[in-house]
From Swiss-Prot:
This is Selection and upkeep of intraepithelial T-cells protein 3. The keyword Transmembrane helix applies. Keywords: Disulfide bond, Glycoprotein, Immunoglobulin domain, Membrane, Repeat, Signal, Transmembrane, Transmembrane helix. The gene is Skint3. Residues 142-231 form the Ig-like C1-type domain. Disulfide bonds join C49-C123, C163-C217. PANTHER family: BUTYROPHILIN, SELECTION AND UPKEEP OF INTRAEPITHELIAL T-CELLS PROTEIN 2-RELATED. Residues 259-283, 346-359, 436-458 are cytoplasmic. Belongs to the SKINT family. Residues 25-237, 305-324, 381-414 are extracellular. Glycans are attached at N200. It is a multi-pass membrane protein. Coiled coil: none annotated. Its main location: membrane.
Amino acid sequence: MGSIQIIFAAYCVVLCVLQMLVLSSEQFTITGLERPVLAPLGGILELSCQLSPPQNAQQMEIRWFRNRYTEPVYLYRNGKDLHGETISKYVERTELLKHDIGKGKVTLRVFKVTVDDDGSYHCVFKDGIFYEEHITEVKVTATSSDIKIIMHPPNIKGVMLECHSRGWFPQPHMEWRDSNGQVIPATSKSQSQDENKLFNMTMNLFADVGLHQIVTCYIQNLLTHQEESISIVLTGDLFSWKIDWILILSIIACVMIPYSMTSYLQQHLIHGSCSQRSHHWRKNAMVCMSSVIAIIGSMLILHLKQRVPISDQHFELDTLYLEDISVILCVVIVFNLKLNLLTYYRLERKYDGCTPGCKACFYILKIIIIILPFVFTFGCYNAIFLKYHQLQKKVSIPDPLYYFYTSWLVNMEMLGVFLVFFPTFINLIEFSQFIKTVPKPIWLCQENMREDDAIRHR
């Protein structure tokens, strides 16, 4: 009988304990925001949690923490704020609003929100051995109006556009659009984070030559849906350099033909016919034309061959290299033409058989032959180099290889300067030697020829 009473008493104790646990588990729950809270960078974040049913929480422990329970963001216990147990970076940036603590409601306020404040926040109410918690998700957002488009100098293939924006969080969405709002695939995209963990975005677009359109760079924060944009108008004026190059090459081609024909005219004045030495003119013309065609063919091969993909970081450097090579080859064309003709005239200085009536015309032609190359060479070189330096002043390439390329380019410019002054120097020597060979002024020669003709008629 005694053992039965003991068992019954133990059963009652267990039943009471279970009943107390059931009752205690129904003491309260915690409610709060179920959706993520957006916190602007540098602003104020407020997170609230509420006991349900409402009850006084002044003698409870209220703990806010992030990832670890033992590292609280804020700790309140028995009516006191325990700042000594909180994380150091939150000590001076947080406060607990306890205006409604009698109803079981508290609010954590965080000042000067940073990117590191992004994440989950746990709100814990503890009463004795019983506790409940609620988790609130915080999303830190940062937008920026600092957006700009950098247009690199137009080149033979098109124009490279760069859209830059900094100070975003989280990583924003970025795209190019045309005037109709249609998305244009970007050539490349890149992002980086600064010391404050904010995203700096860069997006490139390579636009074809000659397109007249409005291109817009859009960037959007996917959390706040805030959007920034900037537009640029691509017109034909951006590619005026192309017309300049066509004009330069056309001038070279147009002047080259009459320049070469001066040999034909010279022989005609000397001998009255070009049949005796026409093969010299043909050889000279063939040498000039073949060399020019070879140089122009090399330029076309370099430009038409896909050397570096557009998405490659060295694409712009390669394009600039092609432009500089084109400048150098244009200089070589002019120099080659000039050198061939100077050599030919140097070897063809025998004017035996020249009739007296053509001496004045011959001297005039000789002056033209000497002066024309000088003017032509000087004009072509100046046009080429002026346009070249106009392009170079606009170039800004952050590529580390650009410095090595610049040193190589300086050497090429020195070579170009040599090619400019060498024919000019030869021209001056030719002109001085020609002046020495002229015994009298040309008009005196013409008077003497008239006197000779008058004597013969008598």
